Structure formats: C-alpha cells, structure tokens
Amino acid sequence: MWGAIIKGDVEEVKQYLALGEDVNLRGLGNMTPLHRAAQNGRKEMVELLIENGADVNAMTDSGETPLDWAINSRHVKLYPQIRKHGGKTGEELKAE
C-alpha cells in the first residue's frame, strides 16, 4: 500500500483497503499511511484514509502527527482538512 500512497494512486489504495489492509499500518519510525499522504500533499488520499478510519493523531516515534508532517512539508491546503477531523500537532497532544 505504501507505494500507492506515495504515487497518489487513490484507486489502488481503495483496493488495498477493500482487501482488509490496515489503514493504520505502521512503517519506519512508526509512521502511518496518513503521515505519508500528508507529507506528500495528497489531499484526496488524506480524505480517503480518514474516511476509512485512519488515526488523525497517530504519533511517530519522534512524537509527530500527520498534521505535523503536513506542516513540515508546507502543505497548507491540508491543515484545515486534518483539523476538521480532530487532527492536532504532537505538541498540542502532549499539552493535553
């Protein structure tokens, strides 16, 4: 599924999800598919993953959320999209 997310192939990711692939699958550094989609600025992919149960506040080993990755990659269009689903930064979560 990782390759499809990086390519931005929404249809391929839909197929993986239909086959039962874990939307919150953990990769290197404990990142999730949503982290990678946010880092790559894939708005449609971000929405698909969230609609399928992606944890918007999943944290990497370094304490970063998908919103942090969108911010660090300067994908401004994703900030409100992730926020409307309850997404926070790692710092915000630590402060709670």
Range-by-range predicted roles:
Residues E12, E44-M45, K77-L78:
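Conserved ankyrin/ankyrin-like repeat signature
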